[in-house]
A protein has these predicted regions:
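Class I SAM-dependent methyltransferase SAM/SAH-binding core
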Residues: 27, 31-68
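Conserved alpha-helix/loop element of class I SAM-dependent methyltransferases that forms part
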Residues: 1-15
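Class I SAM-dependent methyltransferase "Motif I" SAM/SAH-binding loop
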Residues: 22-24
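A short SAM/SAH-binding and catalytic strip from SAM-dependent methyltransferases
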Residues: 79-91
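Alpha-helix C-terminal capping/helix-to-coil transition sites in glycosyltransferase folds
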Residues: 14, 75-76, 102
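S-adenosyl-L-methionine-dependent methyltransferase catalytic module, highlighting the catalytic core
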Residues: 93-101, 105-166
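Short conserved loop adjoining the S-adenosyl-L-methionine
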Residues: 68-74
Length: 166
């Protein structure tokens, strides 16, 4: 279980409604359903991952959040979760604004490209690091926007996205 799942679970209240955007194989959805008794839905771009989720009995639709969040009504969820995915969107600003429209609260986690281990790897090895949160080679990564925590804070201020907990 990823450490970030516990962080997310500690924020989400029991019996709430949740949309997991980029839900991957549904691991977080299962965790929240079991431990928080939430009514949870997912949206995932990968057809294979959607099939895995459905096989687990989870409610997931195949779609791209950059375009498909528009189909959800305003404030239709208590929480909208976007875990480790923001950097893969062409226009992260649109995605954040849609998260805030669809959910009463948004929970966003990002890989910190400024993490000291990442920087040390780059400094001493001279190559882009491969870690558990950054598992791809530079030429085969879905990440198109690399940012640090400070970059994300500045971005949030620019689009009036208030960070409550970090």
């Amino acid at each position: 279980m990823k450490a970030e799942y516990n962080f997310i679970a500690n924020i989400i209240e029991k019996n709430s409604t949740v949309l997991d955007v980029g839900c991957d194989d549904g691991t977080l959805m299962e965790f929240l359903k079991k431990n928080k008794n939430v009514n949870i839905r997912g949206i995932e771009i990968s057809k294979e991952k959607v099939q895995i989720c459905i096989a687990k009995g989870l409610t997931v639709i195949e779609g791209n959040a950059e375009f498909d969040l528009k189909q959800f009504p305003k404030n239709s969820f208590d929480y909208v979760v976007l875990g480790q995915t923001l950097q893969a969107f062409i226009n992260p600003e649109i995605v954040i604004k849609e998260l805030l429209r669809v959910g009463k609260k948004a929970i966003v986690t990002i890989p910190n490209f400024g993490n000291w281990k990442v920087r040390l790897d780059l400094l001493f090895k001279g190559t882009m690091p491969i870690t558990s949160s950054l598992p791809h080679e530079w030429y085969n990564t879905p990440n198109i926007h690399m940012c640090t925590i400070k970059d994300f804070v500045r971005f949030s201020e620019t689009i009036n996205f208030k960070i409550v907990k970090s």
